[in-house]
């Protein structure tokens, strides 16, 4: 009998493997991405203190009118722009990008490109 592979378990293993190497500091915090079927979430985290400095998602009130559906590339672009503007307002210009075990493609790539265009450096 062939068992179906659980893609989320594989993603979590990849994420843990990468997290052993990537840490965020106060000078260069970690930008973590989580992707669900209907939404996308981003947090900028200082791992030394364990605090979330900035967060944004497709569920934010600022994006309610702009985004009709939260699970597509256009919504990811808007979230990338929003998180970059929030981070720059708090004085964060450089981050370490943590793709969360996801392949750098599609929504993850669009979010990263939009954040770079809006002024974040990674």
Swiss-Prot record:
Classification via SUPFAM superfamilies: Translational machinery components
The alphabetical list of record keywords is:
Ribonucleoprotein, Ribosomal protein, RNA-binding, rRNA-binding
Pfam families given in the database record = Ribosomal_L18p
Q: Which GO terms describe its cellular component?
A: cytosolic large ribosomal subunit
Q: Does the keyword Secreted apply?
A: no
Keyword match Ribonucleoprotein: yes
Named from the GO MF annotations, one term is: 5S rRNA binding
Show the InterPro entries listed in the entry. Answer: Ribosomal_uL18_bac-type, Ribosomal_uL18_bac/euk
- Which PANTHER family does this entry report, sorted A to Z? 39S RIBOSOMAL PROTEIN L18, MITOCHONDRIAL, LARGE RIBOSOMAL SUBUNIT PROTEIN UL18M
| Main function | This is one of the proteins that bind and probably mediate the attachment of the 5S RNA into the large ribosomal subunit, where it forms part of the central protuberance.
Q: What's this protein's family per the entry?
A: Belongs to the universal ribosomal protein uL18 family.
Q: What is this protein called?
A: Large ribosomal subunit protein uL18
Give the organism the record lists: Ruminiclostridium cellulolyticum (strain ATCC 35319 / DSM 5812 / JCM 6584 / H10) (Clostridium cellulolyticum)
Query: Which lineage?
Result: Bacteria, Bacillati, Bacillota, Clostridia, Eubacteriales
